[in-house]
Amino acid sequence: MDNMVKTKKQGLLIVISGPSGCGKNSIINELLKIRNNIWVSISCTSREPRGEEKNGINYYFLSKEEFERDIKNDEFLEYAEYSGNYYGTPKKYIKEHLDNGEDVILEIEIQGALKIKEKLDETVFIFIMPPTMNELKRRLINRKTDSLEKIEKRFKRAYEEINEIPKYNYVVVNDDLDKAVKKVDAILEAERCRVDRIEEVYLDSKEERIHEALLDDVKDFDNSKIEIK
């Protein structure tokens, strides 16, 4: 008998957001080690690279003029301005990977996430939380990539972002990286089992087909030799 349930080939579109310093990238990097069907979309930004960030790996770094040109040409699935810089998700490649059955992760700011929610309601939205605000501030300071003024702006912005949690499907507190990764992995597994993501169920088929398939199973069972000791 064929499988009772056939899942869609289409991959999941997953949006992961959270305050700067909550550990989004660390969770995604660990997730890539345990799942081989994930593609992480590379965002575009008009900000300058930080530390050892590389173009085409961490971000596509564009000038403000280049970014605004791409906005006019409708090149982005979403875009937003954050701390004086543009961030956006290029449309290119995302559909291709989804159609190939790969799950696509977008690590984007909340403004952009909410724009995607308006357009694509099947998207899975996950919000990553720091264990405490004091811990978040400590992480931002220890990164040593921003001035104290920028850190204060990020910290204040974090409070605003946390107020948007009810608009997400899931929230994961990153107080332990391994546990946080397992929770996100479990979310993706559960999403694949949702009824509305199933392509075909026998209950949607003709009654005769169900009956014939069940008879085939019974016939195979009767013809099998089972020795009980």
Question: How would you describe each model-predicted region?
Answer:
Residues 24:
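Conserved lysine of the Walker
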Residues 43-104, 111:
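ATP-dependent small-molecule kinase phosphotransfer cores
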